[in-house]
Design a protein with these regions (language model features):
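Signature of N-terminal electron-transfer/Fe-S-associated modules in redox systems
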Residues: 1-182
Length: 182
């Protein structure tokens, strides 16, 4: 066992880690449960993505020992179900949140992208999301979510149309309903 010191979401941690323990395993042990393992540590699903020293990484593919002295951000750094950040709310409003497994990593990556790019292109959005295996929706809703987040950051609210309704007479199916579990 080795002791490391790192900062996670602005909190300092002094942690005992085993030699081959993954960064993801350590983060979950510390209570950061948004860091998922949907690919048995293979590195293709991307649900284990964290921001490590201001760069996206797969936490299952890193050893916890590599985090000594590092600054790490997880999806918990963005907001709570009662106080979402602009990207999280925009993802809900755009109808993109269909998988609670992918959503934390996608929201974290889009938040990180908007911190680095004032007006990201579709190619930049594609690039930042390319590490997440997304099967539940296409990218169009993610583009809308980024546009909505930018609009809210600049104007404080949306004037653009959010997730479309498919038929006015439907109560739930085919009609967007904003809901954040938690």
């Amino acid at each position: 066992m080795n002791k490391i010191v790192c900062t996670v979401n602005g909190r300092n941690h002094s942690v005992e880690v085993k030699g081959a323990e993954s960064l993801r395993s350590m983060l979950v042990r510390l209570g950061y449960t948004s860091v998922r393992d949907s690919d048995d540590c293979e590195g293709f699903a991307g649900t284990d993505t964290v921001i490590f020293n201001d760069a996206p990484v797969y936490s299952n593919l890193m050893l916890a020992q590599q985090a000594d002295g590092a600054e790490i951000r997880t999806a918990e750094s963005m907001g709570t179900s009662r106080n979402l950040n602009v990207v999280q709310q925009a993802m809900i409003d755009a109808g993109v949140v269909q998988s609670a497994y992918n959503a934390p990593a996608a929201a974290l990556l889009l938040t990180w992208l908007l911190e680095h790019e004032t007006r990201p292109s579709r190619e930049q959005i594609d690039q930042v999301l390319s590490g997440i295996f997304i099967r539940d929706t296409g990218y169009e809703h993610y583009y809308l979510a980024v546009d909505l987040a930018l609009e809210r950051m600049q104007k404080g609210s949306y004037s653009s149309e959010i997730a479309p309704s498919f038929r006015a007479e439907l109560t739930y199916v085919g009609t967007p309903k904003s809901k954040a579990d938690g």
